[in-house]
């Protein structure tokens, strides 16, 4: 079985690689459905990239660092574990955000919202269609989370050599 190790500088570079990967993917995703490129496309791309970089940095540093450190401590350091962590954390965070804390909080205002599939919010509460839309979007975002986690893992970890016996 392969064992992997890392160091603080490699972990920092791994987080930076994850921020860049996630931001580029979100920026590219923002162009899906565009039929033509106008004169503001570069400004739009840079704005989306900057915002996404802030979100990914906050998520990787504030949310993912503790579970990642625990998994590392217990020797769960392979790329499949990293991908599972990226998928689960991204899905939970996005789904919780889109559903106002998994339905724990109602909207502050008596608001109703609909999309082409029907109402998603009615009087400040999510409809079944709204829950399904949130689930779908969170699932798509979790795929991006998997790619980000793989990028972090690939930059941060290296196979241990035969002489290395201690935990790092």
Please annotate each region the language model reported.
Residues 1-168:
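Juxtamembrane/disordered regions of integral membrane proteins
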